Design a protein with these regions (language model features):
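Conserved N-terminal phosphate-binding loop of PLP-dependent enzymes in the Aspartate aminotransferase
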Residues: 1-162
């Protein structure tokens, strides 16, 4: 929501909140929060001591440990490399996304390109018939992004030769 200038009255959080340990949370502005009484809203994994301890560590890393700086830096590199590939390969219709959630839309079905990448050590997943998603770990390195883009580049060349 922050990338679009939206400020929600409430938001649900889960999944990555505790680094893979099951947890859930709901945050709300005062006006909305006042509508809830104890027991109105619950989460199976919302507040046990182990999960909340893990969540505290994750929040510390996100806010104070420099992790978000790495996400920004590597996201910019990923975007740059995908745009370079778009200029190089006519089968890339569009490169889109921001941060470490990005994708390319191809003019051909993405399945063969994805399979080629997987066969060469790059695990990818599609999003629909013609889109390849890139959602690397938040700790991804510059070397890993460049290696991934090099594998993708070769797979795109092979797809264009068909």
């Amino acid at each position: 929501y922050q990338a679009y200038g939206v400020e929600p009255d409430g938001a649900c959080f889960a999944k990555g909140l505790a680094g893979g340990v099951p947890i859930g949370a709901f945050m709300a502005k005062d006006k909305l929060a006042q509508a809830f009484k104890p027991g109105d809203h619950a989460s199976t994994f919302g507040g046990n001591p182990f999960a909340t301890s893990c969540g505290t560590v994750v929040m510390h890393e996100l806010l104070d440990g420099g992790l978000l700086d790495n996400v920004k830096k590597q996201g910019e590199l990923l975007s740059k490399r995908l745009m370079e590939l778009k200029q190089k390969h006519s089968i890339i219709k569009e490169a889109r996304g921001f941060g470490l959630i990005q994708g390319i839309e191809l003019t051909i079905p993405a399945g063969d390109v994805i399979a080629d990448c997987i066969n060469n050590g790059l695990l990818l997943v599609g999003a629909g018939a013609n889109v390849i998603r890139f959602v690397p770990a938040l700790i991804v390195t510059e070397k890993e992004i460049n290696e991934a883009m090099d594998i993708l580049d070769k797979a795109l060349f092979r797809a264009e030769e068909k």
